[in-house]
Amino acid sequence: MITRSIGIARRSNSINCIVGSNTSTSYSLDESTKRWISTSTKQPMSLIPTASSLVASSPPNLKPYLQLMRVDKPIGTWLLYWPCTWSIAMATPAGQLPSIYMLSLFGAGAFLMRSAGCVINDLWDKDFDKKVERTKLRPLACGSLTEKQAIGLLAGLLSSSLAILLQLNWYSVAVGASSMALVVGYPLAKRFTYWPQFVLGLTFNWGALLGWCALKGDLSSSAPFWMYAAALQWTLIYDTIYAHQDKADDIMIGVKSTALRLGADTKKWLSAFGVGTVASLTACGIASDQTWPYYVALAATTAQLGWQVGTVDIDNGSDCWDKFKSNSWMGIILFSGIVASTLLKEVFQILIRPYH
């Protein structure tokens, strides 16, 4: 949600900035706007606008706020959302589809909290961002928004998130509120440890616990904890891949990351994290009595992770970005498998009932 390293908060080439917007009438086009204009002149305009095109065409007074929230880079919201959907689908009663209401609540919450995390990140990092070519045009770094404006936006995002959280049971409210220390403190981790991606994993996958207790009312089962462990290791994979784009900048400004810590041994570590992810998801499936579609989906996600780790070029920023974005496919594959597995649970229960 939150991070310079999650691609989300650090991929700032596309940030449009009106430098000194309060005192100047000089405007500059950002890279995403240029690409959008270029693309739209060469191809028929899509009937469905993309997130980046919506931000690029937004009113000038609104655009810096949308950019600060990373609305033009929705991959961060998806990566926050998928563990929530896994948990909700897994906690759904046998033979039923997951609640659209719950999925919608968590979808809105994922968008709001990821946006809030990006604001928090930029408030902490604005002085770093001014020194880096790719980040110096972020709204806070370049001055198109003030700290006061960012804090006002943050207050609105957190208030809206709280309103959504209060729709859940009180156990879930307590679980959700307990994540705030991680949300606020995560951006500081990269100043003190080479493992900020681990802290990100703890923070970013809280929905794996919250989705379960939103339906079940407690965390008495081991299943959500296995899912949380799997999602944490998954984050270590995709965010380490992403962090390799920024190695030179990180060294220059003194920011730490797993990309710098693991270096040439990155693929060995990513392979180990991949094994841990699959093992944890297997344990989660056993603990929650999943049926065969879950394990088919798990095999597909294993292949997807293997492809990522096996083919990523950690010295090629473009390839790292492509592999990073591909993780949304893993999210939807696993979600689909859990939904199908839950629908079949009732059939399996009927079939085995005569033998008990």
Curated annotation (Swiss-Prot):
Function in brief: Catalyzes the prenylation of para-hydroxybenzoate (PHB) with an all-trans polyprenyl group. Mediates the second step in the final reaction sequence of coenzyme Q (CoQ) biosynthesis, which is the condensation of the polyisoprenoid side chain with PHB, generating the first membrane-bound Q intermediate.
Protein name, per record: 4-hydroxybenzoate polyprenyltransferase, mitochondrial
Catalytic reactions of this protein: an all-trans-polyprenyl diphosphate + 4-hydroxybenzoate = a 4-hydroxy-3-(all-trans-polyprenyl)benzoate + diphosphate
Transmembrane segments: 71-91, 93-113, 150-170, 195-215, 269-289, 332-352
Family listed: Belongs to the UbiA prenyltransferase family.
Subcellular location: Mitochondrion inner membrane
Transit peptide: 1-44
One of the GO biological process terms: ubiquinone biosynthetic process
Enzyme class: transferase
Gene name as annotated: coq-2
Family matches, as InterPro entries: HB_polyprenyltransferase-like, Prenyltransferase, UbiA_prenyltransferase, UbiA_prenylTrfase_CS, UbiA_sf
Cofactor(s) essential for the protein: Mg(2+)
UniProt main location, coarse: mitochondrion
Pathway assignment: Cofactor biosynthesis; ubiquinone biosynthesis
Organism for this UniProt entry: Caenorhabditis elegans
Membrane topology of the entry: Multi-pass membrane protein
